[in-house]
C-alpha cells in the first residue's frame, strides 16, 4: 500500500492518486466538544509541505465517496484504502466515546451514503494516543447499534503513539478489538528527522508471530529512496509518503519483486500476507 500523506484538500485526492498512491492519509480535526470539523493538519507538519490545506469534513467525505464509488464520473479505481489520522488535541478524554460516535455518523451519512452504494474504500482509523481508546469503542458501538454492523468489515484500527507495543496491545483490548481483528501497527516520524528501523522490525515480528496482535504494518513518513527500500526490506506492508512516485520508481531487486507488488482492491487489508 502506497499511502499518500496529508491529503487534506479535495483536489489532492486526484493529485496523489495520479502520482501512484493506492491509499491516502487524511487528517481529521475535532472540536473541543468532540465533533469532527475539518480535514486539517496545521503547523508543524512535514518538511517541504504546506501545513494549512483544509476542507469541511462532510464535504471532503462526500468527495471521497465519489472518488471511490464505481460508476461515478470522479471514480478512481486505484484508491482502495483511506487512513483517517484523528487529531484529538482539543478533545477531552471524557468525550472520546462521543467523538467516535460523531465520526461514525458522518461516515455513514457522507461516505457510506446511509449504507446504500457508498464509497468502497477500506477505512483505517488512526488514533494518536492509546488512552483515547474509547473513541474506537464509540465508533463501533454506533455502527452496531444503528443497524450498520456490516460496515465494520470495511474498518480497521491503528494507534500511532510511539510507545511500547505491549501498551498498544492493551489499548486494543480495552477498546474491545480482538487480536488480528483489522489491526494495523504504525511506526515512524516526520520526514524532517531520521529514525532507525528498530521499532518497525519489532512491529513486523509481532505481526508475523502466532501470538501477535496486528495484521499489517506501515511506516511513515518516508520520502528518501534509500529509506523506502529499507522499509520494504524490513517487511512493511504500507509506506506513507509525500512522494508516491518515488515508491513506484524506487529500484527493486529481484527478491523484492518476488515478494511484493502494489495492492489491489481484492487484497484484504485486514489479512496478514504470508511470504
Swiss-Prot record:
Gene Ontology CC annotations of this record: extracellular region
Provide the E.C. number(s) assigned to this enzyme.
4.6.1.-
- Write out the annotated subcellular location: Secreted
For this protein, the record's Gene3D superfamilies field holds: Phosphatidylinositol (PI) phosphodiesterase
Annotated InterPro entries: PLC-like_Pdiesterase_TIM-brl
Q: Does the record bear Lipid metabolism in its keywords?
A: yes
Q: Which domain of life is it from?
A: Eukaryota
What is the main EC category here? lyase
Q: How is the cofactor bound?
A: Binds 1 Mg(2+) ion per subunit.
Tissue specificity, per the record, is:
Expressed by the venom gland.
What is the predominant subcellular site recorded for this chain? Answer: secreted
Catalytic center residues = 5, 41 (nucleophile)
Disulfide bonding pattern of the chain = 45-51, 47-192
Q: Which family does it belong to?
A: Belongs to the arthropod phospholipase D family. Class II subfamily.
Name the job this protein performs: Dermonecrotic toxins cleave the phosphodiester linkage between the phosphate and headgroup of certain phospholipids (sphingolipid and lysolipid substrates), forming an alcohol (often choline) and a cyclic phosphate. This toxin acts on sphingomyelin (SM). It may also act on ceramide phosphoethanolamine (CPE), lysophosphatidylcholine (LPC) and lysophosphatidylethanolamine (LPE), but not on lysophosphatidylserine (LPS), and lysophosphatidylglycerol (LPG). It acts by transphosphatidylation, releasing exclusively cyclic phosphate products as second products.
Q: Mind telling me what this protein is named?
A: Dermonecrotic toxin LhSicTox-alphaVI1i
Species of provenance: Loxosceles hirsuta (Recluse spider)
